[in-house]
């Protein structure tokens, strides 16, 4: 399912996936994180606390793109957790 964001980017929600560097898809305790154009990250579940989500996003962002040291702003809007890259 695709949802349009305010910036025109898309969020993709998947039922099942494993970590894939090329597609930039990762799982976290059955919660799916999807990197779209390296700008948005979304999670279907809010079962993880703020610190864990932030750390997981940063870790996998750097894992996908090794030179990346992005800072993210996190917005929790049930049932989504959305992280936006705000700087390099």
UniProtKB/Swiss-Prot annotation:
Example of a GO biological process term: killing of cells of another organism
Keyword annotations of the record: Antimicrobial, Disulfide bond, Fungicide, Plant defense
Superkingdom, taxonomy of origin: Eukaryota
Disulfide bonds, paired cysteine numbers: 46-61, 54-68
Family: Belongs to the DEFL family.
Protein name stated in the entry: Putative defensin-like protein 315
